[in-house]
Amino acid sequence: TVSSMVNGGRRVTPHLGVSVLDKKGKTVKTFKYGEKEGIVSEKTSETTQELLEKVVSEGSGKNAYLEGYSIGGKTATSQTLPRSAGKYISSFIGFAPADDPQILGMVIIHDPQGIYYGGTIAAPVLRDIYDNVLPYLGIEKK
């Protein structure tokens, strides 16, 4: 999985929440998710983080750039069948902060109208999501 490739090589069960709070902010329930064995070495994971950060800072994922944050990611554009229909799927998967991933998200746009490249149309959507989510998670700008 992509998350395993950027978090030190550890496989983590995907999850949507870590705790439930009452009206006063007191933790009512905490969810625990186990980590499984490594699927790649820490060195491979570190190299992957660095390369995917460059996709956003220097490459096709520039539209995912968010000032003050380091984001890593990968763009993708694929043509659907039949090819003669001229339809595409545009996507971007990204994680932040790039050097210590805390969140991973993916945007998939089926049959975009006009421009259809993942880095052009999907990457900015994840940037806008992270613009709201990262401060909410307490991840500060550098």
Predicted regions and their residues:
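Active-site beta-strand/loop architecture of penicillin-binding DD-peptidases
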Residues: 2-36, 43, 52-141
